[in-house]
A protein has these predicted regions:
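Conserved catalytic cysteine-centered active-site region
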Residues: 55-109, 129, 141-148, 207-233, ...
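Condensing-enzyme catalytic core mediating Claisen C-C bond formation in acyl metabolism
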Residues: 1-26, 211-275, 279, 286-287, ...
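Active-site pocket-lining segment
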Residues: 149, 184, 194, 261-330
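Conserved beta-ketoacyl condensing-enzyme motif
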Residues: 21-90, 94-111, 116-132, 188-200, ...
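Short, well-ordered amphipathic alpha-helical segments that serve as non-catalytic structural scaffolds
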Residues: 26-42, 66-70, 95, 146-153, ...
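N-terminal extracellular/periplasmic Venus flytrap/periplasmic-binding protein-like
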Residues: 10-11, 23-32, 40, 163-251, ...
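Active-site-proximal alpha-helical scaffold in enzymes
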Residues: 85-116, 154-183, 240-247, 334-355, ...
Length: 377
């Protein structure tokens, strides 16, 4: 039985600590988007088999199994269970792949899949960071700062600061063009606050330039090449999708936009975690029975310019087919929500462009990569 994505929606992605969602609880914003998605598809909430929610730091306001909390805040009945997944940056792509595998095995027919992260309200590494002392001393790479991994990749592959800045500028230019063309309108669900609604992403910088980027100091190491401009910003946001069987979609008047053909998760050295998409993409191609030339477009989450550049080069991708509307450097990277965004964005782009096949992929902290192969229905 094939698993299909029938619709998706996301909140605006806004800058942590100073953006429009900094004062909104993550469970609240996730509940609002889940409710919006169900209402616009006129689906009976009781028909949802499970809510699968990705979250990189599931504690504080994101704790106590936020997947189950969203059952209540999203207006679903108590009969619908909920679970929280943590594969760091790949958490909500994992939720989609888990739903797809359940559908293919006959263990369910309709799942609400997504993720959420408030990087304003739940700090990176959580509230009580406590690494294993022996592992930290004997293999410190296991806990390496993500910015250091970006520097490592840049050094290993000879990616200059200027090349990283050109990549970042292109991401902002693509996202600005998409914003002006209204390409984000259908995917955005406004978030209601007591005094206003948040309607629009606020990480995109239409005014940015190579000249302005050139003045920024290195962000992670003295004399390094990675800056704030060539890193994805700390971001608040949430994204959800409806993943169901083709049979369920037909019976309930839902229109599939893409089928989940295959998924893959691989490991890599943690201090080079940004290279994870290379092996994950190679494996998902193998499982789908495709060649790289069979794929019409790619969504590659841009954690950093350096790792994105190397992934594009190593996989032999045409840059014109990658991140048509920009990536996380421009749009933002709320950790637990990004996997759902890139997967569903790839599905939507197949409809918009008339393409047949897409791959969504991303790197994962700790040294992993994840990828999903999609085919237009």
């Amino acid at each position: 039985m094939r698993a299909v994505i029938v619709d998706w929606s996301r909140s605006p992605f806004t800058r942590a600590h100073r953006g429009g969602l900094a004062d909104v609880r993550p469970d609240e914003m996730a509940g609002q988007v889940a409710r919006t998605l169900l209402q616009r598809n006129s689906i009976e909430p009781a028909l949802i088999d499970d809510i699968l929610v990705g979250c990189a730091y599931p504690e504080g306001e994101q704790g106590y199994n936020i997947g189950r909390i969203i059952t209540y805040l999203g207006g679903l009945p108590n009969s619908v269970p909920g679970a929280t997944f943590n594969r760091l940056c790949g958490s909500s792509m994992q939720s989609i792949l888990t739903a797809a595998s359940h559908i293919m095995s006959g263990w369910g027919e309709c799942f609400l899949c997504g993720g959420v992260e408030s990087m304003s309200r739940v700090m990176r590494r959580g509230f009580n960071w406590s690494p294993h002392p022996v592992l930290e001393s004997s293999y410190s790479q296991a806990y390496v700062n993500m910015g250091i991994t970006a520097e490592n990749v840049a050094d290993l592959h000879g990616i200059s600061r200027e090349e990283q800045e050109r990549f970042a500028l292109t991401s902002h230019q693509k996202a600005t063009e998409a914003l002006q063309a209204g390409y984000f309108d259908d995917e955005l669900a406004p978030i209601s606050k007591p005094d206003c609604e948040i309607h629009q992403d606020d990480c995109i910088r239409p005014e940015t330039s190579l000249e302005s980027m050139s003045h920024l100091p290195p962000a992670f190491t003295e004399g390094g090449s990675v800056t704030a401009a060539t890193s994805s910003p700390l971001t608040d946001g949430t994204a959800f999708s409806l993943v169901c069987s083709e049979k369920f979609a037909l019976a309930n008047g839902l229109t599939p936009i893409a089928a989940v053909i295959a998924g893959a998760i691989t490991g890599c050295p943690p201090d080079l975690m940004g290279l994870g998409p290379i092996s994950a993409t190679e494996l998902v191609l193998q499982r789908a029975g495709w060649e790289i030339s069979d794929v019409d477009l790619f969504e590659l989450n841009e954690a950093f310019s350096s790792q994105s550049i190397v992934c594009v080069k190593q996989l032999g991708l045409d840059p014109q087919l990658v991140n048509l509307d920009g990536g996380a450097i421009a749009i933002g990277h709320p950790l637990g929500a990004s996997g759902a965004r890139v997967t569903c964005k790839a599905a939507s782009l197949l409809t918009r462009t008339g393409g047949q096949r897409a791959i969504a992929t991303m790197c994962i902290g700790g040294g992993m990569g994840i990828a999903t192969a999609l085919e237009r229905v």
